[in-house]
Amino acid sequence: MKKIGIFAKVHEEPLEMADQLQKWLVNRDIEVVRRESSPPVLDVTQSNPGHAPADLSCVIVLGGDGTFLSAARWIGNQEIPILGVKFGAVGFLSETRKQDLYPVLESVLKKDFTTQTRTRLLATVREDEKIITTQTVLNDVVINNGTLARLANVNTYVDEEYLTTFRADGLIVATPTGSTAYSLAAGGPILEPQVAAIVLTPICPFTLTNRPLIVTDTSTICMTLAATAMDVTLTFDGQAGLKLNEHHTITIQKAPVPTIMIKVPGQSYFDVLKTKLRWSGGKV
């Protein structure tokens, strides 16, 4: 490996480790590209996150899941492997702990590692047939009501067939990776990362029969808002947002390029799941 990216959360501890890691890599004749996380963007149409250099061998993420999602957004549609190092409180996306980083990196530099692909979603927003933005997400696309105590009526179609109108505080469309994020908090199911599916989870639905729904990842999901919509926002992985109105149409489908995650030997997805959700014997 000749060139590695370091993507760090803007916080004292991750930044200190980024400095140490950069020196460690440079001493091994490896070029380093540094990038730091930035606050969420309120209007995605006015932002340009830039892209990681195409010749990066991998990207090391120092931070929590939010930082990992920012790094995935920076990498974009490039097949650059990501290694997450846990600094946050949950860390579903982090593959190793900070105290284990250097032994893991020794293996990575020797190319002694495996990877796992994670499905992403491609979301296209149109306003009166004009494309406003196209975004790719690793976790989820979320329609969310604002501060006013009003329901968002989300007309939902699957493969051009009308499904229902969700009367709820919002609607989450998540990947299997995103099923352990906002969707889980809203009562959605947990999907193993390799399951070929997309999850639709309503947020606090007014109708009790509006339950989470799992569809195949070959499906195309289309959503519009009722004309009475007020103060409704669309967010992409919690990193960028866009104000919605009844003239917008949101189309979501599986993205052509997945995210590639570096895997640490001896650690399974269910090991991580049990630990994070305290299923390993402790009280929840």
Curated annotation (Swiss-Prot):
Coiled coil: none annotated. Gene3D superfamilies: Probable inorganic polyphosphate/atp-NAD kinase, domain 1 (3.40.50.10330), Probable inorganic polyphosphate/atp-NAD kinase, domain 2 (2.60.200.30). One of its GO terms (biological process) is NAD metabolic process. Pfam families: NAD_kinase, NAD_kinase_C. GO terms for cellular component: cytoplasm. NAD(+) binds at D65, G66, N139, D140, R150, R167, D169, Q239. One of its GO terms (molecular function) is metal ion binding. Involved in the regulation of the intracellular balance of NAD and NADP, and is a key enzyme in the biosynthesis of NADP. Catalyzes specifically the phosphorylation on 2'-hydroxyl of the adenosine moiety of NAD to yield NADP. This is NAD kinase. It comes from Desulfatibacillum aliphaticivorans.
